[in-house]
Amino acid sequence: MLYRGMDRAELDAAYNNRAAVPSAEQILSDWAERSARLRRERQGHVDLRYGDEPRQRLDLFLAANPQAPTVAFIHGGYWQFFDKEGFSFLAEGPLTHGVNVALIEYTLAPAARMEQIVGEIRRAIGWLDEHLVEFGGDPTRIYVAGHSAGGHLTATAMSLGVVRGGLAISGLYDLEPIRLNYLNEKLRLDEAEAGRNSPLLHLPTKAGPLVVAYGTAELPELCRQSIDYAKAWVDAGLPGHLLPIDGADHFTMLEALADPHGVLTEALLRIIR
């Protein structure tokens, strides 16, 4: 057995979200259409550069109110797929409640190793801290959220002093099973690198509140990752809690953030307020 009683084929299947959700491709197509519509309807500052690499850029959608808080959203895709444009639809929920939304893009594997990706997210948040005031935002109220790989990257950003709180959605917090399955063909993690970049093994000594959310219809390994991380977070005396979303799978989870009245939107607002 390779990991927790699973052989390689079983471990591959345990992290294959697209195979587990038959409607995944249709959902992704729907996200793209809704994201394009939001970008047409909401004037945003797009492709703001936080670094010199091609994918070191972010989009910033501003709420109507001045000095608004900002949530920086980090997209998923197992660190090797997708871009910020495909997740613009998520901005609708927070914007409706007067929260700015920054969508962060980053260099993907195999062009980047994990530590570079983690570093890029930290750099993007630092850019927001420095430049939000130029757009009328409040740099003292920066929050971070992310889905799947973005949930992992959200967790790695929680130790930054400028981050006031976070929402980690369907994330990966222990990278050892990732190192051992098909995802590592592009990630190229070795054992030490997986350990260094596993949030479960490197909890901050001080942080703002973190909500760790997962869908009860997700793959069991994805559920376990969130449950284990939330427990470790709380056991370390850090503020936050676990938030299971009943009946949600890995993809439908995000509807609870896109919806202005969704469970994840409400959780984010509670962190901010």
Question: What do these predicted ranges mean?
Answer:
Residues 1-273:
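Alpha/beta-hydrolase superfamily serine-hydrolase fold, recognizing
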